[in-house]
Amino acid sequence: MQNAVSQAISQGIHVRREILGSLTYEQRVFLLEDLFVDLFGHQHVMLQRWAALTGQSAQVDTGYIAQFVASIVLGEPGQGFRGKGDDLADGSEVKSAANISGVDRPRWNHNLGSLDDDEHRRSRGLPTAGEEYLGVPYMFYLLVDRPHGVSDPAPIRIRAWCIDAQEDGDWRDLFETFLTSRRGRTYNFQLHPPVGYDDDVVVNTLGNLDFSNVLVFDARLSLADRDRPEIDWHVPLPTQVIPVTGRTRALRYGGRGARPTRLTNTADIVLGTNDLGALFPGVLAPRDSYDLATVSEIETEAEVEEYS
């Protein structure tokens, strides 16, 4: 990296760290609510419009959004990289998963490298991917889903958890168990977040983790009135997140089917084509048409059987 670029990034980190660190509690809450409405509310409504026409998912890509949230909550900026380097300037990692409008089960993926990758990195005098993960100060996890069994339209739920990666023994033990269990080209350690569940149980076949003591917040975004979105803090953001005093708790893996998939409402996955005239006035005329939600119900049932 050229010196000028390196200096610019370093200066940007310094300035943003001061700005983020000086935010009051009320300012952090205001910024988070504004972000939730902009990126989870308005963007999802816009995507639904185009999904009705194309039959594609109205899922919101939460990757970079989760990093925005983490920076506001933890007061730590990013480095301006796109997919390269640390997610936060202090070396912390951010993971996101979302199921606002879709039928597949999201996961938090951790690329810990294969055995061959480990050997290659060590031959160059570099730490392995697993060693780098276990060396980060904090792991910030974000999940965006909808509460199960809530009246239509169900609110968009945004939850975050933060782990002290140096002090959380059960979290570290599970990572190390995966690292020692690798065979061949196995590299991806997947944690299944509690999509559609009100608890904080994170699932992996090597063992589950209870995240309830590291929950940072639980916010619900209602779009019942799309012109006036409302946010309810089911679990408010604490006034202080760092240092993280809570710890995860190891649980036994319950076996396949112990926690069946809970999907979003079918009509939210694929809107009916009879809405297209109103969604695209001047281009498409209102007309009676076969409602694709009926087809979607059949597709969803098949997906539930596949992923359960």
Swiss-Prot record:
Q: Name one GO molecular function term.
A: type II site-specific deoxyribonuclease activity
Reaction(s) catalyzed by this protein?
Endonucleolytic cleavage of DNA to give specific double-stranded fragments with terminal 5'-phosphates
Where in the sequence is the signal peptide annotated?
Answer: none
Q: Which InterPro entries match?
A: Restrct_endonuc_II_MamI (IPR019067)
Q: Which UniProt keywords apply?
A: Endonuclease, Hydrolase, Nuclease, Restriction system
Where exactly are the transmembrane stretches of this chain? none
Listed GO biological process terms = DNA restriction-modification system
Q: Does the keyword Hydrolase apply?
A: yes
| Coiled-coil ranges from the UniProt annotation | none
Q: What is its EC number?
A: 3.1.21.4
| Source domain of life | Bacteria
Disulfide bonds, paired cysteine numbers = none
At the top of the EC hierarchy, this enzyme's class is: hydrolase
Record's keyword annotation contains Cell inner membrane: no
Q: What is this protein called?
A: Type II restriction enzyme MamI
Which source organism does the UniProt entry give? Answer: Microbacterium ammoniaphilum
Name the gene that codes for it. Answer: mamIR
